């Protein structure tokens, strides 16, 4: 049996919506937002009414009868660490999101918007595989100092969607296979997936792992400490050096990998060096994750927007295909992944979890 599900993905510069009947898209829309539209809002929570109006306007424009919906699902925001899966939106979850208890991000609005519409219709609301999915094995949490534990913050939704898709194509199930999955986008996360759980992964948000188009990844600690106490930067500015103005932006002044690739093909030496270094660091992280899985790997999967770049992926393949076959699953369809998680629950294939 197929179900009608509305999916909601609020991002920092867009609101993405779609209605599915089973795995068929009935309609899909991406509404882009300008900085001017958000100028009067002091924080993400103040955007709620604005995003609600966007949601209603899009649904009305397509003429869809919301009374046909069986469930609503929103992008999972910054919550306490949880295992992967599909979660019912609860008052406890909403309280943590509204108070930004674990951080502020546009995705925090996903569950809130889903809950409001679902309650009006008397149907369930969910989130699926939020970025705080934490399935790390205990040994992976050691950082090297007891004051700091390693955290699992990564592109869990796309990782697990890609893992499920490739496992099915290989005639098996995600929960029965071992993968190293690399999400390549504005942030880069590489995880060791052992039989359905991401047992080790770099923290793609807070300065860990490979550098990306706009994030620094891991930095030499003492040199960064010197920068912290030099008096040249505020805490906010230093944070931007890690997330927002790190990586390719710091080296080449742009986070557009299309621009970087054009420079590489034009023979720009600085671009070539930085491009090769990013591919090198991703490859090295993949190698590290292969050790986590004791070399027993069914496939290495490259996904995310950057996986569309043949030049970039070819460099990773060249350095890692001796470990295992490399499969490219380009892009990220978060709306489809959200829908799939809810369809599995509604069909009784999986059981929903409670936050």
Swiss-Prot record:
InterPro entries, per the entry: Aliphatic_acid_kin_short-chain, Aliphatic_acid_kinase_CS, ATPase_NBD, Butyrate_kin
Stored CDD domains: ASKHA_NBD_BK (cd24011)
Reaction(s) catalysed (UniProt annotation): butanoate + ATP = butanoyl phosphate + ADP
Superkingdom of origin organism: Bacteria
Keywords linked to the UniProt accession: ATP-binding, Cytoplasm, Kinase, Nucleotide-binding, Transferase
GO molecular function: acetate kinase activity; ATP binding; butyrate kinase activity
Protein family per UniProt: Belongs to the acetokinase family.
Name of this protein: Probable butyrate kinase
Species of origin: Listeria innocua serovar 6a (strain ATCC BAA-680 / CLIP 11262)
């Amino acid at each position: 049996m197929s179900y009608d599900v509305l999916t909601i993905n609020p991002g920092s510069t867009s609101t993405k919506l779609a209605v599915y009947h089973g795995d068929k898209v009935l309609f899909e829309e991406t509404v882009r937002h300008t900085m001017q539209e958000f100028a009067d809002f002091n924080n993400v929570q103040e955007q709620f009414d604005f995003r609600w109006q966007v949601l209603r306007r899009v649904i009305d424009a397509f003429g869809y009868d919301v009374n046909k919906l069986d469930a609503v699902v929103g992008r999972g925001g910054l919550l306490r660490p949880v295992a992967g899966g599909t979660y019912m939106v609860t008052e406890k979850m909403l309280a943590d999101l509204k108070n930004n208890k674990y951080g502020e991000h546009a995705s925090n609005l996903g569950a809130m918007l889903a809950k409001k519409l679902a309650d009006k219709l008397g149907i369930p609301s969910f989130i699926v595989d939020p970025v705080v999915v934490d399935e790390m094995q205990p040994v992976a949490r050691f950082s090297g100092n007891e004051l700091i534990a390693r955290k699992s913050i990564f592109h869990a939704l796309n990782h697990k969607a890609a893992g499920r898709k490739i496992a099915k194509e290989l005639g098996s199930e995600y929960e029965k296979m071992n993968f190293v999955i690399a999400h390549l986008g504005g942030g880069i996360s590489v995880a060791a997936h052992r039989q359905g759980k991401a047992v080790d992964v770099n923290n793609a948000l807070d300065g860990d792992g490979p550098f990306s188009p706009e994030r620094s990844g891991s930095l030499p600690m003492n040199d960064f400490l010197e920068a912290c106490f030099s008096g040249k930067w505020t805490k906010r500015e230093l944070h931007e050096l890690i997330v927002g103005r790190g990586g390719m932006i710091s080296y080449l002044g742009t986070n557009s990998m299309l621009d970087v690739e054009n420079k590489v093909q034009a023979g720009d030496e600085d671009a070539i060096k930085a491009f090769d270094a990013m591919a090198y660091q991703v490859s090295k992280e993949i190698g590290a994750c292969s050790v986590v899985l004791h070399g027993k790997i069914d496939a290495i999967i490259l996904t995310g927007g950057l996986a569309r770049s043949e030049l970039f992926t070819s460099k990773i393949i060249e350095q890692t295909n001796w470990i295992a076959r490399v499969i490219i699953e380009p892009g990220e369809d978060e709306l489809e992944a959200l829908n799939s998680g809810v369809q599995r629950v509604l069909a009784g294939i999986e059981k929903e979890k409670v936050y």
